[in-house]
A protein has these predicted regions:
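Macromolecular interaction modules
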Residues: 1-99
């Protein structure tokens, strides 16, 4: 899959699939898809996108990711556009330095 096909799939197929389940609207507070752009003097990134999903709590995050709807409708779609052997996930807490 080309990078352009990946971006299209993530925007037009996978994101709507996620947003269609009620748990997404209930638990996600902010959802950001970022795609690399050419930048002089910077090497090509190792990833095709960065996805940020923000939640009020770890419990809310788990309520989404372990919900029946997510496990049956959203998670199985990952193999259609992601290389699961090279994908990473970070759970983090934000520390604002400049606002």
């Amino acid at each position: 899959m080309s990078h352009e096909e990946f971006v299209r799939y993530q925007r037009e197929v996978h994101r709507p699939l996620l947003m269609a389940i009620p748990e997404a609207g209930r638990y996600i507070r902010r959802f950001v898809l970022s795609f690399p752009i050419p930048a002089p003097d910077y090497s090509d990134p190792d990833y095709d996108s960065v996805v940020e999903a923000w939640f009020d709590s770890m419990e809310d995050m788990n309520a989404l990711y372990f919900s029946e709807n997510f496990l049956k409708k959203v998670s199985p779609d990952h193999v259609n556009f992601m290389d699961l052997s090279s994908h990473g996930r970070v759970v983090a807490e934000e520390e604002i330095v400049v606002d």
